[in-house]
Curated annotation (Swiss-Prot):
Name of the protein: Pseudouridylate synthase RPUSD4, mitochondrial
Gene for this chain: rpusd4
GO cellular component assignments: mitochondrial matrix; nucleus
GO BP, one annotated term: pseudouridine synthesis
Enzyme class: isomerase
Record organism: Danio rerio
UniProt EC number: 5.4.99.-
Keywords: Cytoplasm, Isomerase, Mitochondrion, mRNA processing, mRNA splicing, Nucleus, rRNA processing, Transit peptide, tRNA processing
Length: 358
């Protein structure tokens, strides 16, 4: 009560001082202060105090998201040689045939509009660094990793090694495991999603293209059973194995293992097949529009975010481990990659236990 009286008294004193000043000026112009002006001033001060009380403090996650945004901008502003050195310092594994790096968030494999640094563009510089600056050194991309996805990326030192790795991937002999935080809990908690994916045009105020499901079965009109339909000629077979590792507060930590390599496959299967979009997936959380992901109030509260700030949430999809069969008679190669800090912070905020280290 005493604090409230002091605040009220201080407010009255400020108002009185303001009124006194107004009266001084008014006396020079022979006009009196208007009651409406005083009431308006009091109203504005009251609204300001209310806004101050309702202001949401910046959470550790939001701070990390801001840092991540700045880091992404810095990666695109540095000289390519500096960028290449940063990638080399992030290397996870290296031998005479391949090098595995930890791909940063928001870095594309190939040049796109408005992006200065990409993995492909810096390969010549990175090759020289890995080969003690010898002229003619080369590195080759072995597989795809989306711009917003972090984690293990395999590069080959020769064309022969690149072709070998690509052949292994195409023949489904390479084990790739991802970790994702999903909005929602997949049911059942584990299984295999075998639904082809096709690119579709989205019409409306924001026309664009997205990958979509192209099921091989449809529900009968009477609701009794399903009927197999002919596969669309432009659809791609897409198979994903998934397992929920833990869940709480309406969110889940899910391990994903793609058995095929279709564009946006994991994101499409989670969002459209299981209706559990990946946290930070602003593309597939809505179908008919391009807009920031809308999160439940409980999730926002745990993450320490407001809905207007979700547009800055990164995609929480991480390439955690790749296992390559032995090259030329050597033993299998297992490359693991630690989670990025923003991913760990999100798990902590959601009170989801961190996965065991591999």
């Amino acid at each position: 009560m005493r604090h409230a009286r002091e605040v009220t008294f201080a407010r009255l004193m400020r108002t009185f001082a303001a009124v006194s000043d107004t009266q001084t000026v008014a006396s020079k112009h022979k006009t009196a202060p208007k009651a409406a002006d005083i009431a308006n001033r009091l109203r504005k001060e009251k609204e300001k105090e209310k806004d101050d009380k309702n202001e949401v403090p910046v959470s550790p996650l939001q701070s990390r998201v801001n840092e991540l945004k700045q880091f992404s901008q810095q990666l695109q502003s540095v000289h390519p040689s500096v960028f290449a050195k940063a990638l080399y310092r992030s290397s996870l594994y290296e031998d005479q045939n391949i090098i595995a790096i930890n791909k940063p968030y928001d870095v594309p494999l190939h040049n796109i509009n408005g992006i200065r640094n990409s993995i492909a563009e810096c390969l010549p510089l990175l090759a020289k660094i890995t080969d003690n600056m010898r002229p003619g050194s080369q590195l080759h991309l072995c597989h795809k990793l989306e711009k917003e996805t972090t984690g293990v990326l395999i590069l080959a030192k020769t064309e022969e090694a690149a072709e070998h790795v690509q052949t292994l991937i195409q023949s489904h002999k390479v084990e790739m495991k991802y970790l994702a935080i999903t909005v929602g809990v997949p049911v059942p908690s584990e299984g295999v999603i075998d639904i082809p994916v096709i690119e579709r045009a989205v019409v409306g105020p924001q026309p664009h293209f997205k990958m979509a499901l192209s099921p091989l079965f449809k529900v009968n009109e009477d609701g009794d059973g399903v009927t197999r339909v002919r596969a669309h000629r432009q659809a791609h077979a897409a198979v994903t194995r998934y397992q929920v590792l833990d869940n709480t507060s309406g969110c889940s930590l899910v391990e994903l293992q793609p058995l095929t390599g279709v564009k946006n496959q994991l994101r499409v299967h989670m969002a459209l097949a299981l209706t559990c979009p990946i946290l930070g997936d602003h593309k597939y959380s809505h179908w008919s529009k391009l807009a920031p992901q809308k999160l439940p109030e409980g999730t926002l509260r745990r993450l320490g975010l407001v809905q207007s700030k979700t547009r800055y949430l990164p995609l929480h999809l991480h390439s955690r481990r790749i296992v390559l069969p032995g090259f030329k008679g050597h033993r299998d190669i297992t490359v693991s990659c630690p989670l990025p800090k923003y991913f760990i912070n999100a798990l902590k905020r959601l009170e989801i236990p961190l996965p065991a280290k591999e």
